[in-house]
């Protein structure tokens, strides 16, 4: 994970710690 490509919006938000 960690990519914005093909990732659900909540997925990369959790990666940011939000």
UniProtKB/Swiss-Prot annotation:
<dbReference type="GO" id="GO:0004043">
    <property type="term" value="F:L-aminoadipate-semialdehyde dehydrogenase activity"/>
</dbReference>
<comment type="subunit">
    <text>Homotetramer.</text>
</comment>
<dbReference type="GO" id="GO:0006081">
    <property type="term" value="P:aldehyde metabolic process"/>
</dbReference>
<comment type="similarity">
    <text>Belongs to the aldehyde dehydrogenase family.</text>
</comment>
<keyword id="KW-0520">NAD</keyword>
<dbReference type="GO" id="GO:0004029">
    <property type="term" value="F:aldehyde dehydrogenase (NAD+) activity"/>
</dbReference>
<protein>
    <recommendedName>
        <fullName>Alpha-aminoadipic semialdehyde dehydrogenase</fullName>
        <ecNumber>1.2.1.31</ecNumber>
    </recommendedName>
</protein>
<keyword id="KW-0560">Oxidoreductase</keyword>
């Amino acid at each position: 994970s960690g990519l914005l490509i093909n990732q659900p919006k909540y997925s990369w938000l959790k990666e940011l710690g939000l």
